[in-house]
């Protein structure tokens, strides 16, 4: 089968698992709050349950070293995500949504970890390694699609139940279409089975930085719709910010995927992406539409592009260990994400808003960029010493 078909199917799988299964919670939060199912603090805890599940799923995916294990997690996670989204239509109240979001987090992590490694193998075997990065447009296209669906449903006066049902049916149709087209884990293609040796020293600062990114990006990514709804009460303009976030994120991934490769370019782009994202988080604090618009552009653009850059940087640092490193990086990212909604819940409880949490999120992104900049300089020095 054509590698292009495999990559497109993988992109749509991430559309389902991440864009629908994971991030559809964001446009639903204003509904859940307006319907009296939860308050802002409860919404933060529901999001935290989702990210705790993501952490559990990522850690579990580290154990999927055999093709049969990876196969079960990929397809089990994909179909579980569909079922969970449909089941959310009948859920009401805090605890049912906590349980479902936790399960959705586990399922989405399984799909992301396994499929990221498989897509990289497909692209490398086809002699077109840059193709693998395009699968990261899947989550952002899912965000765009669910955001537009949410806008249409809100204009029609529908609540959270109808939205969950539409998201679930969309995921079901796509999963039926792509199931036979997805790459299958195979014994000889499983990079995790090849001897990789110890991880290079440069990998660990990348892991720490990516964990900080999890803290930094997740608060605006989770609460953007709620922040817009709070500023534009009853206006349809509030529903435009989330699909716009998805569109900008898609453009960011395409820009990174199509950039001209060069020595050290991945590190430079990563530092720039993280610092732009920090500005975007701070911009969410500006009053009115201007602040949210800047937040959409500068948080959305680097949103998935930074994830792609981290994965590319990890492959550059440790090519043979890439499959195992994807799982560890995703676990670190998930741990950071878990801290984000908890910070948001504490911020809401003690200050009545998200301002303190957003300031801490921006600080985490600035620190992550600084760590990557320092690591780049150290790698340059080591390279000069080795040549000398």
What do the predicted segments below correspond to?
Residues 100-138:
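Cytoplasmic helix-loop-helix junction between adjacent transmembrane helices
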Residues 317-352:
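A late C-terminal transmembrane helix in Major Facilitator Superfamily
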Residues 79-92, 275-287:
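C-terminal ends and interior cores of transmembrane alpha-helices
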Residues 26, 203-243:
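Extracytoplasmic gate region of multi-pass secondary transporters
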Residues 94, 125-182:
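Helix-loop-helix hairpin linking two adjacent transmembrane segments in secondary transporters
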Residues 95-104, 290-298:
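Paired small-residue
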Residues 57-70, 252-265, 348:
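Helix-to-loop junctions at the C-terminal end of transmembrane segments
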Residues 266-310:
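C-terminal transmembrane helical hairpin of 12-TM major facilitator-type secondary transporters
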């Amino acid at each position: 089968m054509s590698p292009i078909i495999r990559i497109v199917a993988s992109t749509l799988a991430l559309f389902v698992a991440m864009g629908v299964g994971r991030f559809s919670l964001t446009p639903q939060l204003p509904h859940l709050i307006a319907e009296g199912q939860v308050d802002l603090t409860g919404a933060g805890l529901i999001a935290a349950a989702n990210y705790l599940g993501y952490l559990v799923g990522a850690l579990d995916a580290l154990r999927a070293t055999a093709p049969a294990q990876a196969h079960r997690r990929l397809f089990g996670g994909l179909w579980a995500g569909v079922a969970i989204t449909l089941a959310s239509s009948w859920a009401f109240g805090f605890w049912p949504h906590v349980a479902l979001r936790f399960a959705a987090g586990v399922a989405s992590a399984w799909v992301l970890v396994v499929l990221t490694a498989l897509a990289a193998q497909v692209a490398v075997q086809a002699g077109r390694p840059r193709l693998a990065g395009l699968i990261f447009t899947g989550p952002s296209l899912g965000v765009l699609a669910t955001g537009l669906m949410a806008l249409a449903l809100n204009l029609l006066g529908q609540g959270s139940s109808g939205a969950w049902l539409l998201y679930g049916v969309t995921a079901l149709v796509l999963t039926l279409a792509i199931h036979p087209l997805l790459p299958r884990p195979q014994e000889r293609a499983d990079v995790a089975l090849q001897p990789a040796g110890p991880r290079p020293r440069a990998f660990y600062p990348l892991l720490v930085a990516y964990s900080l990114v999890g803290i930094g990006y997740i608060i605006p990514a989770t609460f953007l719709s709620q922040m817009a709804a709070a500023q534009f009460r009853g206006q349809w303009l509030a529903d435009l910010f989330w699909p716009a976030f998805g569109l900008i994120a898609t453009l960011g991934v395409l820009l990174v995927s199509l950039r001209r490769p060069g020595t050290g370019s991945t590190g430079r782009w990563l530092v720039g992406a993280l610092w732009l994202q920090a500005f975007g988080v701070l911009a969410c604090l500006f009053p009115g539409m201007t602040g949210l618009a800047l937040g959409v552009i500068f948080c959305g653009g680097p949103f998935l592009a930074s994830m792609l850059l981290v994965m590319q940087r990890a492959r550059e640092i440790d090519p043979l260990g890439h499959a195992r490193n994807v799982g560890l990086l995703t676990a670190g990212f998930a741990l950071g994400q878990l801290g984000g909604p908890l910070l948001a819940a504490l911020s809401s409880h003690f200050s009545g808003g998200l301002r303190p949490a957003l300031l801490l999120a921006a600080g985490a992104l600035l620190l992550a960029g600084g760590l990557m900049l320092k690591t780049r300089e150290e790698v340059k020095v080591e390279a000069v010493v080795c040549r000398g």
